[in-house]
Amino acid sequence: KELTSPMPGRVLKIMVKPGDKINIGDSLLSLEAMKMENILKSDGEGIVKEIYISEEQIVDKGEVLIEFQ
């Protein structure tokens, strides 16, 4: 399972790290788009397998941000 960017923007803060156990509703990262901060939250449970982005990185809509197992 993967978290993809719902919009183009800039990653402000990554709130998880590989190996973290996540639950539904956990905050994963914040993304700035059109001068607004958006918190992306988990829609499932699992463990963070890999993070493909870094803070301050510009991302495109649909880009894979985090992979879960």
Model-identified regions with their sequence ranges:
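Structured functional modules or segments
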Residues: 1-69
